[in-house]
Amino acid sequence: MPKALIDTASMAPRMRERIVRPATREILISRVGGSAQEEDITSPVNCGGLGRIRHFQRATADGWPENFLPIDPAARALGLPDAAMMEAQVFQNAACAWRCWYCFVPFELLGGDERRSEWVTAEELVERYAAIDARPRILDLSGGSPDLTPEWIPWTIEALERAGIADDTFLWSDDNLSTDLVFEVLTGVQRAAMAAARYGRVCCFKGFDTESFAFNTGASPEGFERQLERFSRYLDIGIDLYGYVTLTGPSIDSVDEKVARFHERLRSIWRELPSRTVPLRIEAFGPVAKRNAGRDLATAFAVQEAAIAVWQRLNGSPS
């Protein structure tokens, strides 16, 4: 029988409950050290096993656009020159409502398992970050799914200010657009603080239509439209917003038309959005390869190659 699709409306609250303690301002952070993910990390884990250094590279594969995120936003915010690569200190919260087949994080680190993670405050994470020799200028709050714990961002902004390093740190986070918690949990003051800080947010579109969204996330297809609606609401906050998109899907049929419609939807939300959205090329390695062993992904990869050619043409770039 086909696997049942995830009901995001019920899954997201369950995952959130496992990884945040609002009263004590604690977040459950994955312990990368000793996990299956550590095998694919080139630099040693740090910060007591909770952190890792990521090297964000601008260069990508032939036929794909460069990945300027978060390099260009960080450089602008910090007054730095253009760069081909920038390092970031990464922490991952310990849950996600979805189970994307291509996720580089092992699924055992996505379920809010306290045996594989640690309760810490934003202040404690910033203390560990500040103590790193030659610390990266980018602090990346990842996951998991940071949108399950929206408080993490303003709490971290406050902690950076108290530590005296807010002016020379660029805070970056990703957002799966899986919840409305930014509006349900945060105060107007907290949302304004995010807009005023040296902070950027990248929202991850998990496909180009309902079918590809469900295929990629394992969640009910209506989540695709909800992603677009949530991004539209974020624009009103004034955050420095960007997008990622994954272009894999289950069927090659009418890919040109589907991607063109998606591109136009992004333009209708915000004229600049297509140029601020980076397609991520999916590859099978590490946990992704192990998780999908024996699964035929030829069509999914063919779809993304056809889709990127359309995307590049629509963005005015040679494929």
For every predicted segment, state its role:
Residues 97, 208, 248-250:
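Short, solvent-exposed loop/turn segments at secondary-structure junctions
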Residues 162-167, 269-273:
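Short helix-capping segments at alpha-helix termini
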Residues 1-47, 222, 229-319:
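Auxiliary Fe-S-binding modules of radical SAM enzymes
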Residues 30-49, 136-157, 177-187, 279-294:
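Short N-terminal secondary-structure initiator segments
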Residues 107-120, 132-156, 163-226, 242:
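Core AdoMet radical
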Residues 125-128, 155-160, 189-190, 226-230, ...:
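A general structural detector for well-ordered alpha-helical segments in enzyme core domains, enriched
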Residues 10-92, 101, 105-111:
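N-terminal [4Fe-4S]-dependent radical SAM core
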Residues 82-134, 259:
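A glycine-rich, hydrophobic loop/mini-helix early in the fold
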